[in-house]
Amino acid sequence: YAIPRKKINEAMQYQRDTGSTLKITKLFMQAMGLFTSLSNSGEGGELILFLFAEKFLKLPQIICKMNLKTNPEMHYHGADGVHIGVDNHSQKLCLYWGESKLYSDLSQAIYKCMKSISPLITSSLGTGSAEERDIQLLSDFMNVDDPKLENALKKFLDPDEPEFNKLEYRGICLVGFDIDDYPTEPNKLNINDLVSSFNNKIDVWRDSIKKRIVEENIYGISLHVFLVPFPSVDSFRKALLSSLAGE
Protein backbone atom coordinates (compact mmCIF):
# COMPACT_ATOMS: atom_id res chain seq x y z
CA TYR A 1 0.00 0.00 0.00
CA ALA A 2 2.69 2.51 1.00
CA ILE A 3 5.71 1.46 -1.08
CA PRO A 4 5.90 1.31 -4.91
CA ARG A 5 5.89 -2.21 -6.31
CA LYS A 6 9.15 -1.60 -8.16
CA LYS A 7 11.00 -0.87 -4.91
CA ILE A 8 9.55 -3.98 -3.26
CA ASN A 9 10.61 -6.18 -6.18
CA GLU A 10 14.12 -4.72 -6.06
CA ALA A 11 14.38 -5.42 -2.32
CA MET A 12 13.16 -8.99 -2.77
CA GLN A 13 15.67 -9.57 -5.57
CA TYR A 14 18.42 -8.19 -3.31
CA GLN A 15 17.45 -10.71 -0.63
CA ARG A 16 17.54 -13.57 -3.15
CA ASP A 17 20.96 -12.46 -4.40
CA THR A 18 22.59 -11.76 -1.04
CA GLY A 19 20.50 -13.55 1.58
CA SER A 20 20.18 -10.22 3.40
CA THR A 21 16.84 -8.73 4.48
CA LEU A 22 18.39 -5.27 4.90
CA LYS A 23 16.50 -3.57 2.07
CA ILE A 24 13.18 -5.21 2.92
CA THR A 25 13.56 -4.13 6.54
CA LYS A 26 14.32 -0.57 5.45
CA LEU A 27 11.18 -0.51 3.29
CA PHE A 28 9.12 -1.86 6.19
CA MET A 29 10.34 0.91 8.48
CA GLN A 30 9.77 3.48 5.74
CA ALA A 31 6.18 2.28 5.23
CA MET A 32 5.43 2.39 8.95
CA GLY A 33 6.74 5.94 9.13
CA LEU A 34 4.46 7.18 6.35
CA PHE A 35 1.23 6.74 8.32
CA THR A 36 -0.06 9.79 10.14
CA SER A 37 -0.58 9.78 13.89
CA LEU A 38 -3.62 12.08 13.65
CA SER A 39 -6.58 10.64 15.56
CA ASN A 40 -9.08 11.50 12.81
CA SER A 41 -6.99 9.98 10.02
CA GLY A 42 -8.81 8.21 7.21
CA GLU A 43 -5.78 6.12 6.29
CA GLY A 44 -7.24 3.03 7.97
CA GLY A 45 -10.15 3.08 5.55
CA GLU A 46 -7.81 3.74 2.64
CA LEU A 47 -5.70 0.73 3.63
CA ILE A 48 -8.78 -1.54 3.72
CA LEU A 49 -9.88 -0.14 0.35
CA PHE A 50 -6.47 -1.04 -1.09
CA LEU A 51 -6.64 -4.59 0.34
CA PHE A 52 -10.14 -5.22 -1.00
CA ALA A 53 -9.33 -3.80 -4.45
CA GLU A 54 -6.22 -5.94 -4.85
CA LYS A 55 -7.43 -9.12 -3.12
CA PHE A 56 -11.08 -9.39 -4.18
CA LEU A 57 -11.27 -7.30 -7.36
CA LYS A 58 -7.74 -8.17 -8.57
CA LEU A 59 -7.15 -4.52 -9.46
CA PRO A 60 -3.54 -3.45 -8.80
CA GLN A 61 -2.77 -0.09 -7.27
CA ILE A 62 -1.27 2.08 -9.98
CA ILE A 63 0.14 4.85 -7.81
CA CYS A 64 1.43 4.93 -4.22
CA LYS A 65 0.43 8.36 -2.97
CA MET A 66 1.71 7.50 0.52
CA ASN A 67 5.22 7.28 -0.90
CA LEU A 68 4.97 10.86 -2.21
CA LYS A 69 4.54 12.33 1.25
CA THR A 70 7.14 14.79 2.46
CA ASN A 71 5.54 14.83 5.93
CA PRO A 72 3.76 11.81 7.48
CA GLU A 73 1.18 14.09 9.13
CA MET A 74 -0.08 15.42 5.79
CA HIS A 75 -2.73 13.99 3.48
CA TYR A 76 -2.80 14.03 -0.30
CA HIS A 77 -5.87 15.60 -1.87
CA GLY A 78 -7.65 13.72 -4.62
CA ALA A 79 -8.69 10.09 -4.69
CA ASP A 80 -7.99 7.80 -1.73
CA GLY A 81 -6.72 5.19 -4.16
CA VAL A 82 -6.04 4.76 -7.86
CA HIS A 83 -6.26 1.25 -9.34
CA ILE A 84 -6.11 -0.13 -12.86
CA GLY A 85 -7.92 -2.85 -14.79
CA VAL A 86 -9.07 -3.92 -18.25
CA ASP A 87 -12.71 -4.54 -19.19
CA ASN A 88 -13.10 -8.17 -20.28
CA HIS A 89 -15.58 -7.31 -23.04
CA SER A 90 -14.49 -3.96 -24.47
CA GLN A 91 -10.78 -4.36 -23.65
CA LYS A 92 -10.80 -0.74 -22.54
CA LEU A 93 -8.31 0.32 -19.93
CA CYS A 94 -10.28 1.16 -16.80
CA LEU A 95 -9.04 3.61 -14.21
CA TYR A 96 -10.65 3.00 -10.83
CA TRP A 97 -10.81 5.99 -8.50
CA GLY A 98 -11.11 4.93 -4.87
CA GLU A 99 -12.87 6.65 -1.97
CA SER A 100 -13.23 5.48 1.62
CA LYS A 101 -15.33 7.02 4.37
CA LEU A 102 -15.56 5.83 7.96
CA TYR A 103 -18.36 7.35 10.04
CA SER A 104 -20.33 6.10 12.99
CA ASP A 105 -23.55 6.78 11.07
CA LEU A 106 -24.18 4.73 7.91
CA SER A 107 -26.26 7.39 6.14
CA GLN A 108 -23.56 10.00 6.63
CA ALA A 109 -20.84 7.58 5.47
CA ILE A 110 -22.76 6.77 2.27
CA TYR A 111 -23.52 10.45 1.61
CA LYS A 112 -19.90 11.56 2.09
CA CYS A 113 -18.48 8.70 0.03
CA MET A 114 -20.77 9.20 -2.96
CA LYS A 115 -20.31 12.96 -2.78
CA SER A 116 -16.53 12.45 -2.99
CA ILE A 117 -16.47 9.78 -5.71
CA SER A 118 -18.91 11.56 -8.03
CA PRO A 119 -16.60 14.31 -9.39
CA LEU A 120 -13.78 11.80 -9.85
CA ILE A 121 -15.65 9.32 -12.05
CA THR A 122 -17.53 11.99 -14.02
CA SER A 123 -14.59 14.37 -14.41
CA SER A 124 -13.70 16.17 -17.61
CA LEU A 125 -10.29 16.89 -16.06
CA GLY A 126 -10.80 20.60 -15.55
CA THR A 127 -7.68 22.67 -14.99
CA GLY A 128 -6.53 22.58 -11.38
CA SER A 129 -8.89 19.80 -10.36
CA ALA A 130 -7.76 17.17 -7.85
CA GLU A 131 -8.29 14.41 -10.40
CA GLU A 132 -6.17 16.29 -12.96
CA ARG A 133 -3.35 16.37 -10.40
CA ASP A 134 -3.80 12.64 -9.86
CA ILE A 135 -3.47 12.06 -13.59
CA GLN A 136 -0.25 14.08 -13.54
CA LEU A 137 1.00 11.95 -10.65
CA LEU A 138 0.20 8.84 -12.66
CA SER A 139 2.36 10.10 -15.50
CA ASP A 140 5.26 10.90 -13.18
CA PHE A 141 5.08 8.19 -10.48
CA MET A 142 3.40 5.18 -12.07
CA ASN A 143 3.51 2.16 -9.73
CA VAL A 144 4.41 -0.51 -12.27
CA ASP A 145 7.49 -2.64 -12.80
CA ASP A 146 6.96 -3.36 -16.49
CA PRO A 147 8.32 -0.90 -19.11
CA LYS A 148 5.84 -2.03 -21.80
CA LEU A 149 2.88 -1.65 -19.46
CA GLU A 150 4.17 1.70 -18.29
CA ASN A 151 4.44 2.96 -21.86
CA ALA A 152 0.95 1.70 -22.73
CA LEU A 153 -0.52 3.30 -19.63
CA LYS A 154 1.06 6.65 -20.44
CA LYS A 155 -0.57 6.58 -23.86
CA PHE A 156 -3.92 5.76 -22.33
CA LEU A 157 -3.53 8.67 -19.90
CA ASP A 158 -2.35 11.23 -22.46
CA PRO A 159 -5.22 13.31 -23.92
CA ASP A 160 -3.10 13.90 -27.04
CA GLU A 161 -2.85 10.16 -27.80
CA PRO A 162 -5.56 8.33 -29.81
CA GLU A 163 -5.63 5.61 -27.14
CA PHE A 164 -6.85 8.15 -24.57
CA ASN A 165 -10.43 7.70 -25.77
CA LYS A 166 -10.31 4.05 -24.73
CA LEU A 167 -9.89 4.98 -21.08
CA GLU A 168 -12.94 4.47 -18.87
CA TYR A 169 -13.39 5.91 -15.39
CA ARG A 170 -14.88 3.66 -12.72
CA GLY A 171 -15.10 3.75 -8.94
CA ILE A 172 -14.38 1.73 -5.82
CA CYS A 173 -16.00 2.80 -2.56
CA LEU A 174 -15.46 1.62 0.97
CA VAL A 175 -18.14 2.64 3.46
CA GLY A 176 -17.39 1.90 7.11
CA PHE A 177 -19.93 2.47 9.88
CA ASP A 178 -20.88 1.49 13.43
CA ILE A 179 -23.34 -1.31 14.14
CA ASP A 180 -24.61 -2.76 17.42
CA ASP A 181 -24.92 -6.36 16.21
CA TYR A 182 -21.49 -7.45 17.41
CA PRO A 183 -21.55 -9.36 20.72
CA THR A 184 -20.21 -7.58 23.80
CA GLU A 185 -19.66 -10.77 25.79
CA PRO A 186 -17.83 -14.05 25.00
CA ASN A 187 -19.90 -16.86 23.43
CA LYS A 188 -22.98 -14.66 23.19
CA LEU A 189 -23.14 -14.83 19.39
CA ASN A 190 -21.39 -17.05 16.83
CA ILE A 191 -20.23 -16.03 13.37
CA ASN A 192 -23.24 -17.59 11.63
CA ASP A 193 -25.63 -15.57 13.80
CA LEU A 194 -23.72 -12.41 12.95
CA VAL A 195 -23.78 -13.15 9.22
CA SER A 196 -27.52 -13.81 9.40
CA SER A 197 -28.07 -10.50 11.17
CA PHE A 198 -26.10 -8.61 8.50
CA ASN A 199 -27.92 -10.43 5.69
CA ASN A 200 -31.23 -9.23 7.06
CA LYS A 201 -30.04 -5.63 6.70
CA ILE A 202 -28.30 -5.83 3.31
CA ASP A 203 -31.36 -4.91 1.23
CA VAL A 204 -31.91 -1.73 3.24
CA TRP A 205 -28.22 -0.82 2.95
CA ARG A 206 -28.28 -1.48 -0.80
CA ASP A 207 -31.35 0.71 -1.29
CA SER A 208 -29.65 3.57 0.57
CA ILE A 209 -26.65 3.32 -1.74
CA LYS A 210 -28.81 3.19 -4.88
CA LYS A 211 -30.74 6.26 -3.75
CA ARG A 212 -27.55 8.23 -3.22
CA ILE A 213 -26.11 7.08 -6.56
CA VAL A 214 -29.20 8.37 -8.36
CA GLU A 215 -29.08 11.66 -6.46
CA GLU A 216 -25.42 12.14 -7.41
CA ASN A 217 -26.29 11.40 -11.05
CA ILE A 218 -23.71 8.62 -11.35
CA TYR A 219 -26.17 5.83 -12.11
CA GLY A 220 -24.89 3.69 -15.00
CA ILE A 221 -21.21 4.14 -14.14
CA SER A 222 -19.43 0.98 -12.99
CA LEU A 223 -19.00 1.24 -9.23
CA HIS A 224 -17.88 -1.30 -6.62
CA VAL A 225 -19.13 -0.52 -3.11
CA PHE A 226 -17.80 -2.35 -0.04
CA LEU A 227 -19.83 -1.99 3.16
CA VAL A 228 -17.85 -2.68 6.34
CA PRO A 229 -19.81 -2.68 9.62
CA PHE A 230 -17.59 -2.01 12.65
CA PRO A 231 -18.30 -2.42 16.35
CA SER A 232 -16.81 1.09 16.52
CA VAL A 233 -15.14 3.10 13.76
CA ASP A 234 -13.44 5.27 16.37
CA SER A 235 -12.04 2.23 18.19
CA PHE A 236 -10.73 0.87 14.89
CA ARG A 237 -8.85 4.11 14.21
CA LYS A 238 -7.32 4.07 17.69
CA ALA A 239 -6.36 0.38 17.41
CA LEU A 240 -4.70 0.95 14.03
CA LEU A 241 -2.70 3.94 15.28
CA SER A 242 -1.63 1.94 18.33
CA SER A 243 -0.56 -1.00 16.17
CA LEU A 244 1.44 1.19 13.79
CA ALA A 245 3.15 2.79 16.78
CA GLY A 246 4.17 -0.68 17.99
CA GLU A 247 2.11 -0.46 21.16
Which residues does each predicted region cover?
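Interdomain/boundary linker segments immediately adjacent to catalytic/signaling cores
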Residues: 1-40
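Amphipathic alpha-helical segments that form well-ordered structural scaffolds
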Residues: 47-56
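Conserved catalytic cores of phosphodiester-cleaving nucleases, focusing on short active-site segments
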Residues: 53, 80-83, 95-102
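A short acidic/basic microdomain associated with nuclease active sites
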Residues: 57-73
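A short, glycine/Asx- and small/polar-enriched loop/turn
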Residues: 74-78
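Short, solvent-exposed loop/turn segments that connect beta-strands within catalytic domains
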Residues: 87-93
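Acidic, metal/cofactor-coordinating or nucleic-acid-engaging core segments within structured domains
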Residues: 111-192, 196
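Extended, charged low-complexity segments
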Residues: 186-247
